[in-house]
Amino acid sequence: MNGEVALPTMRAILDELRVERDAFLAALDDADPALLTAPGLVGEWSARELLAHMGYWTGHAAEALHRAEQGVLHEFGSDDPDFDVDAVNETVARVARETDLATVRLREEAAYGALVERLAAADDSWLLDTTGYRETLEQVLREDGPEHYREHTIDLRAWFTGDAEATDDDDLDDEAREDEARA
């Protein structure tokens, strides 16, 4: 290596997203179906609420890309200065509790599909552009995409296996996957 740092690419984020979502869905598929709507996975959320949560934030990342396509990423987040992540998460969970699991799955799948489509067509030069709340597009895409799926895959595996504590080994595995996805 010549000491140069590789610039991030949409392709690398897309590849990482695919890997992490596949791991998330595999963890979900490994679960006893009776547990998918039982509360207690993340706080009072069931897997259904968690899946809706993933769909919402994946859609959030797709919306950030849409704003970048339009040349107005700087407005993303500035239109709601009182944005409350916890309130949004609670609203998403409440709606999910009132929705059947199949519909929640379809909504997450649609949000994921929209993000994949936008990532595949996006310009790498947008990654360093900033949003209205001062994060780069890359930060939004990673936090709402692959990093978010990874975080909640650990939650799923821990809850469904009865291991309430995520281990340091899980964190090391995460770092190795991140390095591999970036390579």
Feature names for model-found ranges:
Residues A6, R97, L101-E108, E138, ...:
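Short capping loops/turns at secondary-structure boundaries
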Residues R11-R18, L51, G55, A102-R105, ...:
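Short amphipathic alpha-helical segments with heptad-repeat character
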Residues T37-D86, D124-A183:
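Short, contiguous alpha-helical
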Residues N2-T9, T91-R97:
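Short, contiguous pre-domain boundary segments
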Residues D22-A26, D30, A110-E117, A121, ...:
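A generic structural signal for well-ordered alpha-helical segments enriched in polar/charged residues
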Residues F83-W126:
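Acidic/histidine-rich alpha-helical segments that form the ligand environment
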Residues G3-P33, Y56, H60-R67, E147-R150:
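Alpha-helical bundle segments that constitute or directly flank the non-heme di-iron/ferroxidase center
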Residues E4-D15, Q70-F76, T103, V140:
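Solvent-exposed interaction patches of small proteins and small membrane subunits
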